Amino acid sequence: MKKTVVIGAGFGGLALAIRLQAAGIPTVLLEQRDKPGGRAYVWHDQGFTFDAGPTVITDPTALEALFTLAGRRMEDYVRLLPVKPFYRLCWESGKTLDYANDSAELEAQITQFNPRDVEGYRRFLAYSQAVFQEGYLRLGSVPFLSFRDMLRAGPQLLKLQAWQSVYQSVSRFIEDEHLRQAFSFHSLLVGGNPFTTSSIYTLIHALEREWGVWFPEGGTGALVNGMVKLFTDLGGEIELNARVEELVVADNRVSQVRLADGRIFDTDAVASNADVVNTYKKLLGHHPVGQKRAAALERKSMSNSLFVLYFGLNQPHSQLAHHTICFGPRYRELIDEIFTGSALADDFSLYLHSPCVTDPSLAPPGCASFYVLAPVPHLGNAPLDWAQEGPKLRDRIFDYLEERYMPGLRSQLVTQRIFTPADFHDTLDAHLGSAFSIEPLLTQSAWFRPHNRDSDIANLYLVGAGTHPGAGIPGVVASAKATASLMIEDLQ
């Protein structure tokens, strides 16, 4: 019996496979690595657990919906723990902001920066909530297959001033530069430059205020495992170490999926959660549609890459918050260099993940696991030798953290590893080593983004960061909902 094939067991691929299997469509999930999760890979070392990728869950309802439509309860598969504060934001001046969901507490902290910005923040939150209603709840999981779909959304996008950038939008309401940074950095979580990404992405703030920030007990990998178990409980099949080499096309339909090990899967439909550029360039590079799409996609602007440093310490550093944003001395200038620069900047801003604050089980007793990441240019802009640059940047980051945030860090090191743009390219098959696929510019969003269903190869579908609506766990899970709606309609 032919089965529907989903390529890639990242969050998008898993969510799509669950929706298809729950709808009665026999589905096989092909994952090239030895574990599911895609970017949400997990490493274990000397009793430490390291989530490799996404760590911020802001829409638990989208995940719960996957279990509910399958007639199951999410809490029987994975438990989500609340994160408080959502983030601690730190500046080199010594100023800090604990961003939490308590309005009175948050406004009291805003007053310390600029009393006039309390009212401005209230107006910004109302604006963000309006964008959230339109951009996420109404349009986030609707496939934009024709330009008419874009035109229908146009009036509301104009009303919300979607042509403005995230930073411009925040600045309409808020005066203090620290607070402008605090409420504009969110687009970086999905690969967007706050100074060029559409103000639609201010919806992330409302999303967090609506449902909170959560972390899976046992780490993000525990959520991946729960989703895999749900899929297999429904009768789905998952194949690991299954690298797809080619999509065989006959009469403008994918008829077979060929693996690198020689196996062949006959199929009625294929959805790719693989890198969108390489889906067309590598898997369909022999076909005119693949060549045409790949050439067009290679002209698009890609999001930044990341340098990630994982480390385990024999001290818990309980003074830290779960999520800490460490702003460097520059904001606009540094971000410009991250997105357009041809070299590493002399400074950096960091995201520090301290999951043992919420779940101490991720490290041996008295210890803690961490990761810290620095946004950096992708390989297309900065083709650096990361075998040389990686250890040097690691040492700079360790020095910075030890001086400002984690006294004694180097003497407490038990284990460490780095993951560079070269690893994004080589291990994750990410075009140019981009961490978030196509940059979320307004001219690369919705209909302008690769469509959830290909317009020429009738049974080829896309899911994940490279299609609508975009990157981040809420984005790729929403893309799975959009793509599933098309596939279920086409296949049933």
Swiss-Prot record:
EC number(s) reported in the record: 1.3.99.31
Keyword Flavoprotein: yes
Catalytic activity as recorded in UniProt: 15-cis-phytoene + 4 A = all-trans-lycopene + 4 AH2
UniProt-listed GO biological process terms: carotenoid biosynthetic process
Keywords: Carotenoid biosynthesis, FAD, Flavoprotein, Oxidoreductase
GO molecular function term, any single one: oxidoreductase activity, acting on the CH-CH group of donors
CC cofactor: FAD
NCBIfam families: crtI_fam
Protein name: Phytoene desaturase (lycopene-forming)
Protein's pathway: Carotenoid biosynthesis; lycopene biosynthesis
SUPFAM superfamilies: FAD/NAD(P)-binding domain
List of residues binding FAD: 5-38
Organism annotation: Pseudescherichia vulneris (Escherichia vulneris)
Family of this protein: Belongs to the carotenoid/retinoid oxidoreductase family.
Gene name of the record: crtI
Pfam family, one: Amino_oxidase
